[in-house]
């Protein structure tokens, strides 16, 4: 049902974009309406599950407890920061690029950002699929099964990250052509370097996502929050400005790879320490 609702929303968006923009001539207003109709369609389909004989969810009366709300917010805040940091990083990069090179560099970054959005969406999907399983087996105290799913998630992220990196290196020209229909040579040259350098971050971004979803699943929101904060806020600002000072435009494209690599190192230390703690606790019990 979740897949049907999600895919249906996307299909409705595509169809209504064509109808509202080209058939009705509504322009950007039509595109906006089509975009609004997409999640609305998904919501309607999900709501129909209430009347399905196979339903496993139902509405119940409950009292709102501040302690429960606080716990929910503490666990989910790292995911919120993950989403919000993307907008912050884009804003920061645009300011730096505008002052450093100009509008051509911003156009190049727009192409990189679109590619990054696709990669992040897939990484998010992997994490959201793994988190319920991690939470379940952590709650049941089955640490061996938990480690099995952590290993599987790690391998999945590792393979996906390498594939995205490889695609970015091999098909750079084809990716640029999708956005550079006018054949601007300067834009193509800057974007080619930008994609190939920025794509190094894909090797570590997914692994950091794994850390965020893992620590959220095992009720360690502070660790998840630390990872989100490091990669999205606290590291990117100093790293970006230091690399720009040292390397100019090249430093902009290398900023995220450096940030993701450093964050991964710190996340790995935290994960190994917590894994050893779970092993010791398991041995005692």
Model feature map: region roles:
Residues 1-2, 108-172, 205-224:
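Small-residue-rich hydrophobic transmembrane alpha-helices
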Residues 11-15, 88, 122, 126, ...:
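Residue positions within transmembrane alpha-helices of multi-pass solute transporters
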Residues 16-17, 46, 77, 89, ...:
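Hydrophobic/aromatic residues in alpha-helical transmembrane segments
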Residues 10, 83, 87-91, 100, ...:
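Recurrent gating helices in multi-pass secondary carriers
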Residues 3-7, 45-48, 61-92, 97, ...:
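Hydrophobic faces of transmembrane alpha-helices in multi-pass small-molecule transporters and flippases
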Residues 12, 23-76, 134-200, 243-285:
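Short alpha-helical transmembrane segments in multi-pass integral membrane proteins
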Residues 19-26, 87-114, 118, 136, ...:
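Helix-terminus/linker motif at the lipid-water interface of multi-pass membrane proteins
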Residues 4-11, 33, 37, 77, ...:
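Hydrophobic residues within alpha-helical transmembrane segments
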């Amino acid at each position: 049902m979740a897949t049907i609702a999600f895919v249906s929303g996307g299909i409705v968006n595509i169809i209504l974009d064509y109808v509202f923009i080209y058939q009705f001539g509504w322009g950007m207003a039509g595109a906006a309406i089509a975009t609004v109709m997409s999640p609305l369609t998904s919501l309607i389909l999900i709501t129909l599950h209430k009347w399905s004989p196979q339903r496993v969810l139902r509405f119940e009366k409950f009292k709102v407890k501040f302690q429960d709300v606080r716990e929910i917010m503490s666990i989910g805040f790292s995911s919120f920061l993950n989403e919000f940091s993307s907008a912050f990083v884009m804003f920061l990069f645009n300011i730096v690029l505008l002052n450093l090179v100009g509008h051509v560099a911003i156009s190049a970054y727009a192409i990189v950002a679109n590619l990054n959005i696709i990669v992040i969406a897939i990484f998010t999907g992997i994490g959201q699929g793994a988190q319920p399983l991690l939470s379940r087996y952590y709650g049941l105290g089955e640490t061996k099964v938990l480690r099995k799913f952590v290993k599987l998630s790690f391998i999945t992220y590792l393979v996906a990250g390498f594939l995205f990196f490889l695609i970015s290196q091999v098909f750079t020209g084809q990716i640029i052509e999708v956005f550079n229909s006018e054949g601007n040579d300067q834009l193509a040259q800057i974007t080619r370097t930008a994609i190939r350098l920025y794509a190094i971050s894909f090797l570590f971004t997914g692994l950091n996502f794994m850390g965020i979803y893992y620590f959220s699943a095992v009720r360690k929101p502070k660790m998840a929050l630390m990872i989100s904060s490091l990669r999205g806020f606290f590291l990117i600002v100093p790293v970006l400005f230091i690399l720009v000072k040292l390397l100019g435009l090249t430093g902009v494209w290398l900023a995220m790879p450096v940030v993701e690599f450093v964050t991964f190192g710190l996340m790995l230390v935290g994960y190994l320490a917590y894994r050893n703690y779970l092993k010791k606790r398991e041995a005692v019990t």
